[in-house]
Every structure is written in C-alpha cells, then in structure tokens.
A protein has these predicted regions:
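Macromolecular interaction modules
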Residues: 1-100
Length: 100
C-alpha cells in the first residue's frame, strides 16, 4: 500500500471551510476511479509540549501502489485536484510518498 502524505503548514493562510466542504469531497470523488482506496484528514490541534504545531492539516491518501498514484495525478482529474489547491491555500503543500 502506498501512503501519500500531504501537509499544510500552520503559518500559511488556509480556508479550512473550503478545504473540508469542497476540496476533500472533490479528491474522494475524482480520484476514487483512479485507484484511491481511502483518505484520512487530520486537523492538528497541538503538540505534546504545547509548542505551536508546524502543520494545521495533515492528509493521507492511500493507493495500492505508487504507479496508481502517479497515474491518478497525471489524469485530468488529478490535475483538477492539484489546481484546486489555490482555492484554499496560499502556499504549496509538502507531499511525501511512503509505503505501508
């Protein structure tokens, strides 16, 4: 299983209402036909030490393998998902690929 982790930094302006109300449903709708198995979204509320958290949202997308993820993001649907980021986030999220 391939886990794609997308992090949104705390110090970058983000419209979380749009993210949860529009972007997350769009990702699930558009990428499920391209191999998206599931998605987890975590709103970060703090750290164990009380220090400010470096991220406000961490999202993990699960695909069977990295080939499916690459194909999904290269599709028209994947490009639409990436383009939509500008509608709610003033920066570029960090995207990491992991294996479970």
């Amino acid at each position: 299983m391939t886990a794609i982790t997308v992090t949104y930094k705390s110090d970058v302006k983000m419209n979380t209402d749009y993210y949860f109300g529009s972007h997350v449903p769009m990702v699930e709708d558009r990428l499920s036909s391209h191999g998206l198995r599931s998605a987890e979204v975590r709103k970060i509320v703090g750290t164990p030490t009380g220090a400010p958290a470096p991220y406000q949202i961490i999202t993990t997308l699960y695909f069977d393998n990295v080939t499916d993820f690459t194909a999904a993001m290269g599709s028209d649907d994947g490009r639409a998902v990436l383009k939509d980021i500008a509608n709610f986030y003033d920066g570029t999220p960090d995207i990491m690929i992991g294996e479970t």
